Swiss-Prot record:
Stretches with biased composition (Basic and acidic residues): 71-81
Superkingdom per UniProt: Eukaryota
PANTHER family membership: SMALL INTEGRAL MEMBRANE PROTEIN 14
Cellular component terms (Gene Ontology): endoplasmic reticulum
Protein name: Small integral membrane protein 14
Region described as Disordered: spans on this chain: 71-101
Compositional bias per record (Pro residues), positions renumbered to this chain: 92-101
Amino acid sequence: MSDPCECFFDHESAMQRLLAMLRNSQADCTDTGCDNDGLSREGGNTMMMWTLLWTFMAMALYVMRPNSMRSDRRTADDAAIEKPTGSSDDNTPPPPPPSAM
């Protein structure tokens, strides 16, 4: 089963598909050369549209990212909130470890 369509079509249908593909290729190409490069104009245009769409979506997501993902300079208040420092009193004992009970 080298042909995936072999499960659905018999040998005669496969030959008809092959002949149809050959006839279609003869309309595009002759013995001396081909009229087009093998890609239809719509195919190349569609690829360009998809590329532009993905680029636009990536730029929109980058611009609308939340503040937590931005690497802007943070103020001293923000740094104090994110990285707590020890208390100013050095004589306080550390908190007791959690009990196993």
